[in-house]
Amino acid sequence: MIEYRGDHKVTAVDAQTGTSKFEIQEDVKATVINALPNMRAGLVAVNAGLNNMANGRWCGVNYLTFESTAAKDVHVLGDSIQIAAGMPKSGHMANAQAKVAAAAIVAQLNGWEVNPNPMLTNTCYSMVDAKNCIHVASVHQYVAAEKTFKTVAGSGGVSSIDLKPEVTMLEGAYAESWAQNIWADTLA
């Protein structure tokens, strides 16, 4: 059985006994524990002084270019940024952000107009076993009037809760193909 305890603040994990200790709630013993620390910008971003949002947890950016709002000509993307509403923190999203940032940098270096209407796509696959998978997908459009990205209405997609095994196996094949393509694209 899997239990999510999002309202529990973990203060310690005893790997020897498999026990999670919480700030308020009683200790929980489990066979497998996946304790996740609070997310925040990475140490490189913090040491560079770029973490200027949400009490220093995240880096603010101009979403049109992904230029830092704390340092001119420095671009930040991926897990370190303060995300727009509905924007996931995923490798696919970081890859899409990098493309928008790279295009903006090239435009700025050449004195061209930065693309005023960038779009981002996202797909996240989660393997539920060695062959079966579920997914979530979305498209995000830059909204100039609000200076942020918004999820495009109707663009989201998630695996149905009632998927048959042959469908989740097909999604597993899609996930493998997606992984090969995103790695090739990212490392090209």
For each predicted feature, which ranges?
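FAD-binding beta-loop-beta segment adjacent to the flavin cofactor pocket
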Residues: 57-75, 130-149
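FAD-site-proximal beta/loop scaffold in flavoenzymes
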Residues: 28-95
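A conserved FAD-binding loop/helix module that cradles the flavin
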Residues: 80-122, 126, 136
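A structured beta-alpha segment of the ubiquitous adenosine-cofactor-binding alpha/beta core
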Residues: 10, 22-26
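A conserved short coil-to-beta-strand element within the FAD-binding core of flavoproteins
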Residues: 2-18
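Hydrophobic residues embedded in beta-strands of well-ordered beta-sheets
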Residues: 18-20, 133-134
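Glycine-rich beta-alpha junction loops
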Residues: 10, 32-40, 123, 128-132
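C-terminal auxiliary extensions adjacent to catalytic cores
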Residues: 136-188
